[in-house]
UniProtKB/Swiss-Prot annotation:
Gene Ontology terms: cellular component: extracellular region; host cell postsynaptic membrane
Subcellular location: Secreted
Function field: Acts as an inhibitor of nicotinic acetylcholine receptors (nAChR). Specifically inhibits the alpha-7 nAChRs of D.melanogaster, and seems to have no inhibitory effect on vertebrate nAChR subtypes.
Keyword Lipid biosynthesis among record annotations: no
Higher taxonomy: Eukaryota, Metazoa, Spiralia, Lophotrochozoa, Mollusca
UniProt remark on domains: The cysteine framework is I (CC-C-C). Alpha4/3 pattern.
Record PTM Cysteine amide, positions in chain: 13
Similarity comment: family membership: Belongs to the conotoxin A superfamily.
Disulphides: 3-9, 4-13
Modified residues (4-hydroxyproline): 7
Protein name stated in the entry: Alpha-conotoxin BruIB
Length: 13
């Protein structure tokens, strides 16, 4: 999964 789809990650999408 991409970082965008991970609840533990806060990416800039």
């Amino acid at each position: 999964d991409y970082c965008c789809r991970r609840p533990t990650c806060i990416p800039i999408c």
